[in-house]
């Protein structure tokens, strides 16, 4: 059965064809060919007919999911062309053998790994959904959604998926999504200064903030340039050989931890959740690398401890939309809205300080200090503008080569996304977790964190020839979170004890004064 999608075209998109944006063209370059993959766990059995009917009524109404990629004979001009969509062709329901059900977690990892090796069919819209009747340790059934990155970034894709979901507690209500405008430290400073300080002091603050912003932006721009030209990360056990990465098989693993533990740390340390996640990631990487270097020491019978000066940097993805959180599809597609569908993100080079520390809270403090400086900069916006200019002036091949070189000189990719705060259902099927990430870029390690309800899911995509034990890396991440939580709890206990001691001393002093007064009166 075919569905004609043209009647769903909005007034702003009556054109049958639309050219690819510079970012979308980059994602189709041979150096990248990036895809987004999301493993979704469900509480109940999946009904393929219900999903197909739901996709017909909602999902394919979006132009990008009812358009195919068309390339000219010379391969230079690429465009989206609206087409008829046979929804059933995009659904895959594999037959799973009984022996695979016994070790379902390993089978799911192998299935997703094989799926990441197969390119999407460009003769139809670039997405597909796999429905697996497979019970795993944390889900009754599993779905795997695969979408080409040229269709949109993670924020766009998630907004569309969530627009198709409903609250489990109220099937008629859309998920409650965080919707907060960015409030940088510099903007709050200027607002506060304009209200309470004199004009001269406020002017000094404005000038000082502008100077710091400019210096940080220049530093980030120079870091981008030198990284592209010659500055490479240390050859650690998690940095891959990117010349042959495309021929290697990737693996996706995930681990779910308590979001309440992260919030407890956030509140105690006066940080954001993103600060805590970066700090825990830094601690987990340090712990994992220390083990890997120790194993090599045992194997080679040579002293090879964790080096003191390791340059390990991440390409940290930054959402450039003027609002934070995941915007619902209606807001994102509304005419005049500041939120737009597509690939609207830049990235900054984020250095992780790799070391084993006696106080695990130092990892949080270092990460917060670094990311605070990165936030007070237009470095991410500059990378976005730079990519667009290079694509237009020098062509997609030169631009892809430059970006590929810059990314290859770093070690990993990191991203973080906020999810629904309550349980949601996908066409009537309650969801237990989202494990999403992207692949195709030249990194042996990609870490993506996504919150959902009171949980945080950490998803790793690794090159198994470089990181053969990704579950141990997940263990180190989780153990680092536990040690940081324990340190925070201990600090809070000591702080409470100090408060009680001060209170005790003051009460004792007060009683002494009262006793002295009574003695004199008598």
Curated annotation (Swiss-Prot):
- Name what induces it: Induced in roots during drought and salt stresses, and upon abscisic acid (ABA) treatment.
User: Which residues are modified by glycosylation?
Assistant: 270, 409
Question: Which residues lie in Basic and acidic residues bias regions?
Answer: 1-12
**Statement: the UniProt record of this protein carries the keyword Disulfide bond:** no
Instruction: Give start-end of the signal peptide.
Output: none
Note down the stretches annotated as region Disordered: 1-20
What role is this protein assigned?
Bifunctional wax ester synthase/diacylglycerol acyltransferase. Involved in cuticular wax biosynthesis.
Name this polypeptide is given: Wax ester synthase/diacylglycerol acyltransferase 4
């Amino acid at each position: 059965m075919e569905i004609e999608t043209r009647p769903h075209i909005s007034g702003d998109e009556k054109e049958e064809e639309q050219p690819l944006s510079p970012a979308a063209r980059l994602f189709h370059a041979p150096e990248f060919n990036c895809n987004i993959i999301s493993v979704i766990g469900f509480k109940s059995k999946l009904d393929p007919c219900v999903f197909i009917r739901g996709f017909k009524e909602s999902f394919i109404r979006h132009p990008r999911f009812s358009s195919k990629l068309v390339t000219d004979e010379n391969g230079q001009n690429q465009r989206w062309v609206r087409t008829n969509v046979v929804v059933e062709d995009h659904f895959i329901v594999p037959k799973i053998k009984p022996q695979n059900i016994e070790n379902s977690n390993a089978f799911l990892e192998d299935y997703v790994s094989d799926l990441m090796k197969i390119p999407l069919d460009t003769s139809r819209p670039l997405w597909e959904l796999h429905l697996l009747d497979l019970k795993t340790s944390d889900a009754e059934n599993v779905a795997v959604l695969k979408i080409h990155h040229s269709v949109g970034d993670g924020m766009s894709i998630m907004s569309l998926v969530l627009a198709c979901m409903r609250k489990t507690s109220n099937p008629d209500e859309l998920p409650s999504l965080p919707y907060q405008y960015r409030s940088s430290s510099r903007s709050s400073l200027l607002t506060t200064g304009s209200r309470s300080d004199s004009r001269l002091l406020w002017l000094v603050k404005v000038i000082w903030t502008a100077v710091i912003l400019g210096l940080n932006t220049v530093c980030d721009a120079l870091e981008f340039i030198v990284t592209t030209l010659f500055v490479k990360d240390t050859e650690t056990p998690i940095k891959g050989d990117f010349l042959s990465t495309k021929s290697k098989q990737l693996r996706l693993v995930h681990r779910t931890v308590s979001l309440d533990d992260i919030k407890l740390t956030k509140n105690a340390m006066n940080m954001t959740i993103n600060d805590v996640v970066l700090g825990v990631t830094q601690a987990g990487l340090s712990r994992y690398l220390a083990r890997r270097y120790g194993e090599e020491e045992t194997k080679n019978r040579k002293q090879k401890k964790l080096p003191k000066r390791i340059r390990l940097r991440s390409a940290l993805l930054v959402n450039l939309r003027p609002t934070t959180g995941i915007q619902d599809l209606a807001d994102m597609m509304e005419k005049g809205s500041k939120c737009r569908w597509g690939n609207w993100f830049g990235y900054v080079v984020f250095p992780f300080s790799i070391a084993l520390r006696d106080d695990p809270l130092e990892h949080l403090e270092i990460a917060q200090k670094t990311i605070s400086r990165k936030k007070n900069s237009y470095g991410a916006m500059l990378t976005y503008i730079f990519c667009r200019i290079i694509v237009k002036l020098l062509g997609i091949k030169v631009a892809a080569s430059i970006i590929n070189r810059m990314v290859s000189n770093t070690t990993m990719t990191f991203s973080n996304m906020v999810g629904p705060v309550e349980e949601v259902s996908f066409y009537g099927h309650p969801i237990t977790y989202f494990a999403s990430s992207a692949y195709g870029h030249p990194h042996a390690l990609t870490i993506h964190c996504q919150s959902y309800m009171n949980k945080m899911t950490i998803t790793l995509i690794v090159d198994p020839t470089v990181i053969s034990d990704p579950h141990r890396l997940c263990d180190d991440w989780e153990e680092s979170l536990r040690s940081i939580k324990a340190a925070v709890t201990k600090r809070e206990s000591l702080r409470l004890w100090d408060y009680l001691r001060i209170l005790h001393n003051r009460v004792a002093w007060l009683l002494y004064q009262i006793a002295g007064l009574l003695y004199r009166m008598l």
